[in-house]
Amino acid sequence: MLRLSKFQIGRGAAFLYIENLISMAYGYAFWYILSRITTPDVIGVSSSLISLVTIMVSIASIGIPVGSQRFLGKIFLEGRFEDAKVVVESSLVVVTFGIILCSIVLLIAREWLFGAYQTNLIILALILVAGTTINILLRYIIIASLDTKKILVITIIASGVKLLLTIILVSQIEAESSVIIGFSIAPILSAILFAFSIRSIFKKTQNNSSFKFIGTLRIILSASVVAWIPSLMDTIGSQIGNVMMLGIQGANQAGIYFIAFQIVIGISAIIWALESVAYPILSAMNQGRRLVLWRIIKIGLVIVLPLSVSLIFYSRDIMQIFGQNYTEGSLPLQLLLISVFPTAISAGISILMFAYGNYRDVLVIGLASSIPRIVFYFIFIPSYSGTGAALSFTLGSIIGLVVSLIIGKRFDIILVWKDLVLICCIPLVFAFGLSTFNFHFIPAILISIILSYIVLLRYKIVTREDVQDSMSILPSNIAIPIINTVNKIGSKLNKNY
């Protein structure tokens, strides 16, 4: 099973990884263009509403996407498509009920929750909640099937439509409305295309499942609710900062902070892609889970840390890309980038605990990061604006890391700290050194990343197996030449490579 898992993770993560890169590129292009044709106030209002919608989506989903994925991962691997169909149908029923209930509550409490927004934005927000919730569930189902190539294609289509439509609408109607309409179209279009893809998976299935609808409904709900609470708290802890920025510091400051936050979310998404594919695999495994988790955490950090650490020393240049008004976000960006390392480890341990069925530990890890964040938001945002919000987020990530390590110790989690420290510190040294020489930030960041990988190869912190596993996410005609080239370099740098 371990050998199968490595193949499945590599294959499944291939398209998710590329999809995340494309989503990241589309996202940066989206907010870059908006920053050029609108104002920070428009971005602040739009982004805070999107953050509220994200919280509402987490409530409406009732944790069903993650809860159902735990069962679907094993069912798909065993080829029991009739049973998988029952799980999918049960999940859709629960999520639909959650959307209806959440919409009713939102309409009743609209003055309290959305008092700062116009009526048309509230209506669009409800549509966005429904579309996004269904989209996330269907996306998780396809991830569980490991047929993630479909996600890549659908994301390219939906993201392109969102970007083009929003640019057109900004010049025609109110800027905030155009942003929310664009965000609504993408998940709705994706959900429709995902639905057709899932239908094709079950096209040849018979109605002879061993699962009963009501019984499956209860099992999924029991597994989902325990995952729902920590997931909801994590969502609130990460998203409420932008909402509070709007309420306390105003739309301008909220927009600046949101851009910095999105940059970090885009980088972190690469690790989340690997861990998302790993979850259904880990749930289906009986042995070797801890080793697989360590490999995933290490590979993810090897990919993102050289970049994220380098950006810390050039944060002002990065924020200036979006316009001179956004340079205030350089310090918040630096603080948020620090959170990448602790978040990757704590999220990985949390996924392993959920795969083990230790829901209480998942809840504790989630609360350990989200509750301190919320408390710190109230303390730091009034006095330190975006810097306070970023500091609160990162402090919550560090506390979550500490708690996850305490929990992980009980299960003998495999973490090679020597490798982790070097993966973090080597890019730090190069980026700091280059930043003292007034190089243009683009070549400086590239040089820092290249030198970091050379040293990691030289001292065998990145091994031949790491390279092969990392490149397995790419198509073979691309991966093989890269692997051969890197292996040649590694062999020249270290004879024992």
List each language-model region with its residue ranges:
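Membrane-interface junctions at transmembrane-helix termini in multi-pass inner-membrane proteins
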Residues: 131-154, 284, 337-368, 410
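Hydrophobic alpha-helical transmembrane segments
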Residues: 123, 152-202, 367-373, 386-407, ...
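Transmembrane helical elements of multi-pass membrane transporters/channels
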Residues: 11-28, 158, 182-198, 211-280, ...
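Membrane-proximal transmembrane or re-entrant/amphipathic helices at the cytosolic face
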Residues: 2, 435-497
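Interfacial segments at transmembrane-helix termini and the short loops linking adjacent helices
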Residues: 110-125, 251, 311-347
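Helix-loop junctions and terminal segments of transmembrane helices
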Residues: 32, 61-78, 144, 260, ...
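Signature of the first transmembrane helix
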Residues: 7-65, 103, 128, 163, ...
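Interhelical loop/hinge segments that connect adjacent transmembrane helices in multipass membrane
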Residues: 1-9, 176-182, 194-238, 277, ...
